[in-house]
Amino acid sequence: MSALRNYLNKIKPNFQKGGKLHAFESVFDGFESFLYVPNTTAKSGASIHDSIDSKRIMSFVVIALIPALLFGMYNVGYQNFKAAGTLDTASFIEVFGFGFLAVLPKLLVSYIVGLGIEFAWAQWKHEEIQEGYLVSGIIIPLIIPISTPLWMLALACAFAVIFCKEIFGGTGMNIFNVAVGARMFLFFSYPLAMSGDKVWVAKDAIFGLGNTLPDGFTAATPLGQLAQGSMPSASLCDSIIGFIPGCIGETSVIAIAIDAIILLWTGIASWKTMGSVFAGGIVMALIFQALGMTPIAWYEHIVLGGFCFGAVFMATDPVTSARTEKGKYFYGFIIGAIAVIVRVMNPGYPEGMMLAIFFGNMFAPLIDYCVVQSNISRRAKRAIK
């Protein structure tokens, strides 16, 4: 690493003002700050709250995503071999290797397109490159079906980065979660590629691994089966472990629980927001079940679909979620409740977490405003007394 540090110091003058490559200063600073702590200090007094800066936050979230990512890769291979009837004779390496080769291109496209736009935008605006897309670049591939074409994913990443992030001012200024923006773009632009029973299992062999399935092969998700009024073919145990069709990173409750522990232990995610999402979903599910409006049990709403993934990774986004302590409770509860409302009231769209987080992001500033104004009014009355 010292050799790399010395090399960067050697070429750095070329990218500084007056250097031959000054036009690419933002790109160089982006790579340098990604590898090392930036060589800058505050010129005036600074208030340091803790040692966690934005780069460390992003790094911890990326680490927390690894269990869901790795299990998602394995499950992609698992579903392919299971559909072909060759799961019993396949080795772990074959199953995971197929899933790895199927998911890797989506990760590469997400990062190449998203970071490419971020680099170009920083060059155009003469700004520093931010680390925010390091997390979004993994989340976006994890919340789409495995059969999503790469060109659709590229369009979604471009739309999300430009219209959900950069036009608001970049990292820390966006009001909508970038991954939610990408998912909504895909769902409303290409609904047939994001729903139904033909998009959840990879159907083509890759470099000799996996199986080529018939074009007419279908595999519905358990949540989709429940929405159609039939019992899911997968057991509750398989649903919790994650051996079910679904979006790449959303199937395993156990993997997501490990992710949640990491985020809560590091203090990056708020337990108030995360817990309130689950509370809102459970309360609303119990209400609908008591009224006889749905046969789906409350725990099925939690373990199926993208509820857990959305509650852990997307609802807790510190930029787009509510920031006041009381507001976090209302914000999370609203998201959980809306997710179940959409699932029950709209059978044609069994997954409601995406819209729930979108509306939660929309109302987060209003929630914070109401909480702050309530505190001001209460203190004013106390002062008068």
Predicted regions and their residues:
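N-terminal signal-anchor module of multipass membrane proteins
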Residues: 1-107, 383
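C-terminal ends of transmembrane helices
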Residues: 42-48, 114-125, 162-172, 258-266, ...
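Structural signature of hydrophobic alpha-helical transmembrane segments
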Residues: 96-110, 147-156, 239-253, 295-307
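Hydrophobic, membrane-inserted alpha-helices
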Residues: 113-118, 133-142, 157-164, 254-262, ...
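Membrane-interface helix-loop-helix junctions at boundaries between adjacent transmembrane segments
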Residues: 128-209
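Loop-to-transmembrane alpha-helix initiation sites
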Residues: 154, 175-180, 298-306, 328-330, ...
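Long hydrophobic alpha-helical segments that form multi-pass transmembrane helix bundles
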Residues: 172-257
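A beta-strand-loop signature enriched in Asp, Gly, Thr, and Trp
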Residues: 274-325
